[in-house]
Amino acid sequence: MGKRILVQRRGRGGSQFRSPSWKRDGPVRYPPNISGRGIVVEILHEPGLNAPVAKIRMENGVEFFNYAAEGLYVGQVIQVGPDAPPAVGNVLPLGKIPEGTMVFNVEKRFGDGGKFARSGGTYALVIGQRPEENKTIVRLPSGRVIEVDARGRATIGIVAGGGRVEKPFVKAGKKYHRARAKSWKYPTVRGKAMSPYAHPHGGGSHQKGGTPVPKTAPPGQKVGFIGSRCTGRGCVRARAQQKQ
């Protein structure tokens, strides 16, 4: 008799697979209908997030969390709203931001709190305005160019914490604590190293690569490389030749 494989257990959504949001001080998002001046009260480390978080208190007493911009400091005064100057740390509507400005925590839809360019060291670039359509053209960190609502908000600057991926984990224990903060399953066992009852790639007198599952397979059946461009030993070599 077979057993539920890891993909199926994760899809069920048990507590060990849920991100521990209760360990954080609050969601990192813009509050609705807010403008004015505020002050950076504290810069926090939030478990599971890969960038520092700034706690901002507005003049009316409203507090919210936003990713800290590179160079932001405790006690700095920031401004929020359409009348704010495009200075580092200020939050403005995209339609009021000059072309060529680096921004982060960009709203996909007006009022959603911020969806794009939220990782440490990343930024999006405002490359154009279409006031007649109330749209702003933004280049994302991936290089993709999109149009978003010009009323959507963004923060001026670059997310702090750049260079994080350049520092190696060195020890498996560090990787364990990182995975635990984000509820990743760690360490992960290769499917082809399992028994046949535990994984579709398991079993056999010797290990061999599994057959990729089709993209049309239902959830719970998708294992291994999903939609891979190439597999096998020559895969890395083929990608290197394509780049050249």
Swiss-Prot record:
GO CC terms of this entry? cytosolic large ribosomal subunit
Task: Reply yes or no: does the keyword Ligase apply.
Answer: no
Pfam families in the cross-refs: Ribosomal_L2, Ribosomal_L2_C
Q: Cite the InterPro entries for this sequence.
A: NA-bd_OB-fold (IPR012340), Rib_uL2_dom2 (IPR014722), Ribosomal_uL2 (IPR002171), Ribosomal_uL2_arc_euk (IPR023672), Ribosomal_uL2_C (IPR022669), Ribosomal_uL2_dom3 (IPR014726), Ribosomal_uL2_RNA-bd_dom (IPR022666), Translation_prot_SH3-like_sf (IPR008991)
Query: What segment(s) does the record annotate as region Disordered?
Result: 1-26, 193-225
Q: According to the UniProt entry, which residue ranges have a biased composition of type Basic residues?
A: 1-12
Coiled-coil region list: none
Organism superkingdom:
Archaea
Q: Which of UniProt's keywords are assigned here?
A: Ribonucleoprotein, Ribosomal protein, RNA-binding, rRNA-binding
User: Per its record, what are the GO molecular function terms?
Assistant: rRNA binding; structural constituent of ribosome
Q: What does this protein do?
A: One of the primary rRNA binding proteins. Required for association of the 30S and 50S subunits to form the 70S ribosome, for tRNA binding and peptide bond formation. It has been suggested to have peptidyltransferase activity; this is somewhat controversial. Makes several contacts with the 16S rRNA in the 70S ribosome.
Q: Which family does it belong to?
A: Belongs to the universal ribosomal protein uL2 family.
* Assembly mode: Part of the 50S ribosomal subunit. Forms a bridge to the 30S subunit in the 70S ribosome.
Protein name in UniProt: Large ribosomal subunit protein uL2
What organism is the protein native to? Answer: Pyrobaculum calidifontis (strain DSM 21063 / JCM 11548 / VA1)
The protein's gene is named rpl2
